Amino acid sequence: MLLIPAIDLKDGQCVRLKQGEMDDATVFSEDPAAMARHWIKQGARRLHLVDLNGAFAGKPKNGGAIRAITDEVGDDIPVQLGGGIRDLDTIEHYLDNGISYVIIGTAAVKNPGFLHDACGAFPGHIIVGLDAKDGKVAVDGWSKMTGHDVVDLAKKFEDYGVEAVIYTDIGRDGMLSGVNIEATVRLARALRIPVIASGGIASLTDIEALCAVEDEGIMGAITGRAIYEGTLDLSAAQSRADALRAPGGAA
């Protein structure tokens, strides 16, 4: 189980939003590259970046901060990035500049043909991000609900060739209210590709609960507010996850 620290970028700073509200942001660092370095020292093996301005504007907005992070981590740590990715040129630019995986969210739901083309052009580098509440997919920075069932849509995108699905329970993200294990497992069981859980992780208990269902197809978990506010120690949590995965690991 990979624990993946989230670095959410707004106006060049590392912030956290509560339930996706841009005007409810807490600034945790004015130096995102230093934050990336910190999480790697704590044992992170992958980083999750979100261009929040880009997600709302529909085009990249934090290029300087993103490049500073990829320069900092080099080729050693895979970096996945989402937010404002709406065309193939943007994907190519990011992949050419140190990003390992590009996350397509709203654009995949609104324009499935774009996701299909992206998977064909950049095989192995496209992750789809599905944000859902009560099993239904949300788009546009969570501001609009759709009628799409998250499992049905994920299965369709799996057939396109996406590398993984990031599943965010938007009723829980940034609220430290615990992971929606049932919904995450339901999705993972329906797919052949890995699922990365997101939203609601508050403590080591949540990590242990995810590790217990890891074999259902859950490869990792994105954590944000918990590691920034100190309710979860990233290093201890990754060590615990590794121990549970080891042969004979205690439950």
Swiss-Prot record:
Its EC number is 5.3.1.16. GO terms for biological process: L-histidine biosynthetic process; L-tryptophan biosynthetic process. One of its GO terms (cellular component) is cytoplasm. The gene is hisA. Its main location: cytoplasm. GO terms for molecular function: 1-(5-phosphoribosyl)-5-[(5-phosphoribosylamino)methylideneamino]imidazole-4-carboxamide isomerase activity. This is 1-(5-phosphoribosyl)-5-[(5-phosphoribosylamino)methylideneamino] imidazole-4-carboxamide isomerase. SUPFAM superfamilies: Ribulose-phoshate binding barrel. Gene3D superfamilies: Aldolase class I.
